[in-house]
């Protein structure tokens, strides 16, 4: 990732706090929108969502200043590292503290989320490996490929360059899975 020109400064801390605050506000407003919608306040729900979108853009602006966004390969590596920290250190530490303080159900939830974070790390590492081995759109074995835009199905070792149905590029193809 690119160097963070603010490293070690109070400005860096301010940017980190701004990013965290905007990110948390976005999530809160999304949750609030769901409540407003359930209670029959469609306009208020829409305004919470509109504001959440604004907060997302504010957070993105601060994250970019911190050099937190790179190319997909580096983003996958950073995401895997973050997920690794969450499942190996953060949630386990939180679970131990919760147990010590008598919150056993919460400790179990922390550990359960830690297991989910472990899966997230594995997913990101597998996707990173696909990029590194040039196997995102071409596999060594025959697969069923599906256009994520229109649903067109093709069987082969490689996704089509262009979908013949909707003309979307190869980037819209993924290995088709049915999990139902």
Language-model features: where?
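Non-heme di-metal
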Residues: 1-180
């Amino acid at each position: 990732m690119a160097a963070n020109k603010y490293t070690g400064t109070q400005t860096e801390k301010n940017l980190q706090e701004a990013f965290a605050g905007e990110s948390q506000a976005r999530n809160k407003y999304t949750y609030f929108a769901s409540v407003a919608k359930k209670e029959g306040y469609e306009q208020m729900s829409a305004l919470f969502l509109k504001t959440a979108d604004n907060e997302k853009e504010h957070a993105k602006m601060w994250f970019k200043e911190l050099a937190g966004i790179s190319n997909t390969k580096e983003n996958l590596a950073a995401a895997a590292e973050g997920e690794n920290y969450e499942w190996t250190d953060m949630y386990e530490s939180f679970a131990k503290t919760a147990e010590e303080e008598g919150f056993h159900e919460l400790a179990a939830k922390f550990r359960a989320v830690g297991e989910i974070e472990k899966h997230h790390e594995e997913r990101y590492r597998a996707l990173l490996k696909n990029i590194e081995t040039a196997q995102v759109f071409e596999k060594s074995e025959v697969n069923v490929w599906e256009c994520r835009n229109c649903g067109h199905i093709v069987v082969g070792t490689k996704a089509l360059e262009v979908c013949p149905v909707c003309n979307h590029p190869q980037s819209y193809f993924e290995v088709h899975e049915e999990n139902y």
